[in-house]
Amino acid sequence: MAQAPDAFVYNATLERIVDGDTFDCSLDLGFDVKLHKQRVRLAGIDTPESRTRDLEEKKLGLAAKERLKELCVGKIKIKSLGKGKYGRILGIPYTAEGKDICQMLIDEGHAVIYEGG
């Protein structure tokens, strides 16, 4: 995965989980500037779809979505890697303890490595 300078790491608060690899959050840019309803696509991973007619994939997708929700409780940090092909922020979220949430989802079997955006 590409590395962003620390200047592009922001405090964030989860607003809504869209699926296992996408969520909406508010970003604290510092100096009392906050951006709400920012859509973040987790960089470098892909999870099963939670909105599909394939019942097995849906089950796995809902499990990934739930795990992402658990990992994003409280304050998180987002390392922004820029915008993806659909205009979403590509980012790597970190837990309050500094753990890479993308890597955790891969390690736990909820996600696979993905090179798209």
Regions found by a protein language model. Name each.
Residues 1-117:
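Small beta-barrel nucleic-acid-binding modules, primarily SNase/OB-fold domains
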